[in-house]
A protein has these predicted regions:
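A generic structural signal for short hydrophobic patches within well-formed alpha-helices
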Residues: 9-10, 39, 75, 112-113
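Short active-site oxyanion
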Residues: 29-32, 64-66, 100-104
Length: 126
């Protein structure tokens, strides 16, 4: 299972050089984990930057993946991740979700660098 972080989603969606580098690491859609926090961040970014229609299309795509809602177990693990790794709340929820589901976290966000179960794809120049 792969949890694709919002940063990786955005790079992939805009077709950046970094997004192109991610393509080989993306599994079939059924093996993507999508926390509801990632859905929130994607909807917010897409609506602001691209438009509501594209946001609706991407959220529909995520719903074919394995959507993981925030529950008490993940919330408590996220609180610990905030403390232990000094992550912001949204990042901690995403990290804790990956850990709870024993998934690899695929990201372009350096906040996750060095954490267990994380594959960091460095941003490439345009």
């Amino acid at each position: 299972m792969i949890l694709v972080d919002t940063s990786a989603w955005i790079e992939w969606l805009i077709g950046s050089p970094t997004g192109d580098a991610l393509v080989d690491q993306l599994p079939e859609q059924a093996y993507w984990l999508v926390p509801t926090m990632v859905q929130l961040e994607l909807a917010k970014w897409l609506t602001r930057e691209i438009g509501e229609d594209k946001a609706d299309q991407v959220i529909a795509f995520t719903q074919v993946c394995q959507v993981v809602p925030l529950d008490t177990e993940i919330a408590l693990a996220a609180a610990e991740a905030c403390r232990a790794h000094r992550l912001a709340t949204a990042d901690a929820i995403i990290f804790a979700t990956a850990q709870a589901r024993r998934a690899t976290l695929l990201t372009c966000d350096r906040h996750f660098e060095g954490l267990p179960g994380v594959t960091l794809v460095e941003k490439r120049p345009a």
